[in-house]
A protein has these predicted regions:
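Primarily mature extracellular domains of secreted and cell-surface proteins
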Residues: 1-253
Length: 253
């Protein structure tokens, strides 16, 4: 599992964050160097003078290499499709123009739109991950998304908007552009929604985020939409039990 490069290959649109960095420094509060930023002691505060809205964004995430291998392997015999996102180098790239970043940290929220749908086992397995959002502050963060998964009977369960993964974030702002990468570990809600393929705390594919920053933003936008779903769907949809996984794990997620 590796972090996707959001500037190379096929991109969702005619340009990849077409930002004039030389002109953007003043508008976005200048650069923060290569540090991840953060606060110490208590909750972070918002500096309205350095808070900027997201005018264009990319979020890249591959879920997990072994999960994708399982979907297309001899057990699940499945595939995946995207809607409003593109596949690039083992990751799914979502695009948008939502969020806000305090460049003095940096901290904030970057949101994107689109979905990826995984299917397998003749359609019994079906998992949809949609509209991801990365919220970060002080080197930590959360990957939030809308997730729907089928149970072993093929009945869909809507988990709602949940915190899929906890993030360890490294981010910087330079010339009006936020660049960040994050290590991702699966939450309990994320494990439930991904059909219990992985235990909570499992290291997932890394997340990449890139955003062009423009004019002033409301400090309230820094926190994003947050997780509003319950993170459970009434039963454990143990779709992993559908396949007789080999002992060597070659086709296992």
């Amino acid at each position: 599992d590796r972090a996707p490069d959001l500037t190379l290959g096929t991109t969702p649109g005619p340009r990849v964050l077409g930002v004039d960095r030389s002109a953007g420094a003043g508008a976005a509060g200048g650069g923060t160097g290569g540090t991840s930023g953060g606060t110490s002691g208590g909750a972070p505060t918002c500096d309205a003078s350095t808070t900027r809205r997201v005018s264009e964004s990319r979020i890249g995430w591959g879920v997990k290499d072994s999960f994708r291998s399982y979907i297309r392997g001899s057990v699940a015999k499945g595939s995946w499709t995207t809607d409003g996102a593109v596949e690039n180098g083992g990751a799914f790239i979502f695009s948008g123009a939502e969020g806000a970043v305090d460049t003095s940290g940096p901290r904030g929220t970057v949101a994107a739109r689109g979905s990826v749908t995984f299917t397998g086992h003749g359609g019994t397995l079906r998992t949809v991950v949609a509209d991801p959002e990365v919220t970060f502050s002080g080197g930590t963060g959360t990957l939030t998304a809308d997730v729907t998964s089928n149970d072993t009977q093929g009945t869909p369960h809507a988990y709602g908007r949940i915190a899929v993964a906890d993030l360890t974030v490294t981010a910087s702002v330079d010339g009006g552009v936020l660049d960040g990468t994050a290590e991702a570990t699966l939450t309990q809600a994320g494990a439930n929604a991904l059909s219990d393929f992985y235990e909570p705390g499992t290291v997932m594919s890394p997340v990449s985020v890139r955003a062009a920053l423009a004019g002033a933003a409301d400090c309230g936008a820094l926190d994003g939409s947050g997780a509003t779903g319950a993170g459970t769907a009434g039963s454990t949809p143990d779709v992993a039990s559908l396949g007789a996984l080999p002992a060597d794990g070659s086709s296992a997620p």
